[in-house]
A protein has these predicted regions:
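Residue-level signal for the nucleotide or nucleotide-sugar donor/cofactor binding architecture
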Residues: 26, 34-37, 80-81, 122-126, ...
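C-terminal "lid/loop" region of Rossmann-like NAD(P)-dependent oxidoreductases
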Residues: 146, 175-176, 184-191, 195-214, ...
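Conserved C-terminal active-site "lid" loop/helix of NAD(P)H-dependent oxidoreductases
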Residues: 156, 185-188, 203-225, 231-235, ...
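Glycine/proline-rich active-site loop of Rossmann-fold NAD(P)-dependent oxidoreductases
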Residues: 88, 113-129, 137-139, 144, ...
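Hydrophobic "lid"/C-terminal helical patch
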Residues: 163-167, 190-193, 214, 233-240
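N-terminal Rossmann-like NAD(P)+-binding domain of SDR-like oxidoreductases, especially those catalyzing
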Residues: 1-113, 157, 234, 239, ...
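A short C-terminal helix-loop "cap" of Rossmann-like NAD(P)-dependent dehydrogenase/epimerase domains
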Residues: 102, 131-143, 194-201, 215
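Hydrophobic alpha-helix immediately C-terminal to the catalytic Tyr-X-X-X-Lys motif of short-chain
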Residues: 89, 93, 97, 127, ...
Length: 269
């Protein structure tokens, strides 16, 4: 099947994969088959078919709980759960193929991407999807901890531009952070969305902050983000109806959905 897709292709954008933390803990085999073996298959075919450039969508979750903020690409990688590990292993396959076989590839480590047409179904996960479904239903936002944790919320159009610029470049064998150039409290997001709040227990193995150092991608590719959080949230609210069929998470459902998270990651170091 992949062989047919690969006819007359100049660029490959490898975004296919399994996301979400809890399912990766419960079904690690699926994640290894898709995110690791799948990435190997893409690297192999990209080389065989002489693709001009392959761009891999890596995850900033590879950093685990970073020691430095903003976090540079040289920071230690310490994935804390199978999703993060499998995305990191996929990246390492591409970097190895670049080093050994001279595959033209770049890896973009994405930070907290959000925007219209995001997935609206599936397991409990990204804060934007959870909050937007709650807002549409007139329910309180379920804020993890006290909401002072910060995230590098990065708008999807900025990410798309990074992929395009990377594909058009002559750069290869590099890992590049893609972030907003800022980090925002979850409480800030709540204030922009406007609504009541219920605080739920903080989860283990989650960083208090994500914040990309984007110096490298700016220097090597001239890329920089253009969409502020305020602008991005305004766009999301324009598309609020997209979440009308999304799962609606309350405290009881979240507690049930995250049992494996607490069970296996509570003593994670």
């Amino acid at each position: 099947m992949l062989e047919k897709i690969y006819s007359n292709i100049d660029w490959v954008f490898h975004l296919a994969g399994l996301a979400d933390i809890v399912p990766s803990i419960e079904f690690p085999d699926n994640y290894f088959q898709t995110n690791v073996i799948g990435s190997y298959n893409i690297a192999k075919l990209s080389l065989e078919k002489n693709v001009k450039r392959t761009i891999y969508a890596a995850s900033s979750s590879c950093y685990g709980i970073p020691d430095f903020f903003p976090t540079p690409e040289t920071a230690k990688c310490d994935p804390r759960y199978p999703y993060a590990l499998t995305k990191y292993l996929g990246e390492q396959i591409f970097m190895h193929w670049s080093s050994v076989y001279r595959l033209n590839v770049l890896s973009l480590r994405l930070f907290n991407v959000y925007g219209p047409r995001a997935r609206t179904s599936g397991t409990y996960g990204a804060v934007f999807g959870v909050f937007l479904a709650q807002k549409l239903a007139g329910k309180p936002f379920t804020v993890v901890g006290d909401g002072t944790q910060t995230r590098d919320f990065t708008f999807v159009s900025d990410v798309c531009r990074a992929f395009l610029i990377a594909a058009q470049s002559q750069l290869s064998g590099e890992i590049l952070n893609v972030g907003s150039g800022n980090t925002y409290e979850v409480n800030k997001l709540v204030s922009l969305l406007e609504g009541p709040v219920i605080n739920i227990p903080k989860r283990p193995a989650e960083p208090d902050q994500t914040f990309a150092d984007i110096t490298k991608i700016n220097k090597l590719l001239g890329w920089k983000p253009e969409v502020s959080l305020e602008e991005g949230v305004a766009v999301m609210l324009e598309h609020l109806q997209d979440w009308k069929d999304a799962p609606l998470w309350d405290t009881n459902k979240i507690e049930g959905a995250t049992k494996s998270w607490f069970k296996y990651l509570a003593d994670s170091h």
